[in-house]
Every structure is written in structure tokens, then in C-alpha cells.
């Protein structure tokens, strides 16, 4: 914290006015950068005129993965520190005017869907955890395969997750 306040030219009291500790600032930065990724993906989605929740979700996932594939330092920063708790905190805190209201936009996409899904927050959690945990090694190390080879499997898995969350779905029969 001493290095941060010295480089920023502010007093420690000022730092602690805005952040609880160094982990709080890290989490806010991760949340902000992740929000930027989702915001850019949402802008691209609107420009694409893709309809249907499933197709929109796949588009957003691909858009974000494409960006992370070209910016491995951003991937390293976000993925190593990404947790549901960071997202959850970002959803619950009062966002700045500049922050993208990702969770609300996600709920809006769900509301426009012809399909009703149970537990929207749990659905989002499951997809974020799947994508972030499995794509990291594919992008940075091409392990166990490169991202291009992995994507079809990722998308089919997302489709299975969506099927499992359909309201009234008999998961035993899926």
C-alpha cells in the first residue's frame, strides 16, 4: 500500500477512504477490467443483430475469448484472480456511471428469451466458472489443446448447461 500511495501521490488515509486494503483495489481493478470486456462484447453483440439468448451468449463468450487470446497479459491478470466473489461484489455494489451494468444486461437478455431459465445467477456463475477455468490453459499454453480446437467442445458444454437450467427441465432425461 505504501508503494501505491507513494506512486499515486496520495496519503494512506485517502487510499483507505476508497479501498479496504490492497486486495480490495485488486478486486475492483479485476471487476472493472472484466466489466470492460463484457461491455465491449455487448456493443459488438448489438452491432451484430444476433437474436436468441443462446446465440447471443455464444457470441459474447467468443468475443471475450478472442480479446483475451490477443491480450494474454489481461488474461493472466483477470483469470488468475477471477472469482465469483469478485463478480458478485461488483453486481451488488453501486456501480460508477462509467461501469457497465453487466448483470442487468444479462438479465435483460434472459427476459427477451423465448425460454425461461431457473436460477439466472447460478446459470451465469456456472458458465463464467466453466469458461474462465477451462480456457486459461488453452489460450496461454495450448494445453491440452489450442483454443480453436477447444471452442466447439466449450460451446456444446455451454449448450448442455443451458438445457439443464431450462425451467421445468427434467435433468435426468437430458
Label for each model-derived stretch:
Residues 1-24, 28:
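Helix-turn-helix
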Residues 19, 26-40, 78, 98:
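Alpha-helical DNA-contacting segments of helix-turn-helix folds
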Residues 28, 42-70, 124-127:
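Hydrophobic alpha-helical connector segments
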Residues 29, 33, 37, 41, ...:
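Hydrophobic recognition helices of helix-based DNA-binding modules
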Residues 66-104, 140:
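Short secondary-structure transition hinges
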Residues 1, 27, 31, 54, ...:
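Short, structured helix-loop boundary elements
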Residues 110-157, 165-174:
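Hydrophobic/aromatic-rich alpha-helical bundle segments in the mid-to-C-terminal region
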Residues 35-39, 86-114, 121-125, 159:
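Amphipathic alpha-helical packing segments from all-alpha helical-bundle domains
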Amino acid at each position: 500500500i505504501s508503494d501505491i500511495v507513494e506512486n499515486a501521490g496520495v496519503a494512506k488515509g485517502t487510499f483507505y477512504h476508497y479501498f479496504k486494503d490492497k486486495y480490495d483495489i485488486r478486486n475492483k481493478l479485476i471487476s472493472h477490467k472484466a466489466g470492460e470486456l463484457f461491455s465491449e462484447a455487448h456493443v459488438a453483440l448489438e452491432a451484430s443483430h444476433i437474436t436468441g439468448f443462446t446465440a447471443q451468449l455464444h457470441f459474447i463468450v467468443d468475443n471475450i475469448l478472442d480479446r483475451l487470446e490477443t491480450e494474454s497479459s489481461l488474461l493472466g491478470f483477470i483469470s488468475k484472480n477471477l472469482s465469483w466473489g469478485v463478480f458478485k461484489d461488483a453486481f451488488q455494489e453501486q456501480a460508477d456511471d462509467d461501469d457497465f451494468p453487466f448483470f442487468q444486461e444479462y438479465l435483460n437478455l434472459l427476459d427477451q428469451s423465448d425460454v425461461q431459465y431457473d436460477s439466472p445467477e447460478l446459470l451465469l456463475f456456472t458458465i463464467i466458472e466453466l469458461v474462465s477455468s477451462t480456457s486459461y490453459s488453452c489460450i496461454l499454453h495450448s494445453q491440452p489443446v489450442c483454443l480453436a480446437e477447444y471452442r466447439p467442445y466449450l460451446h456444446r458444454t455451454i449448450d448442455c448447461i443451458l438445457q439443464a437450467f431450462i425451467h421445468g427441465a427434467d435433468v435426468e432425461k437430458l
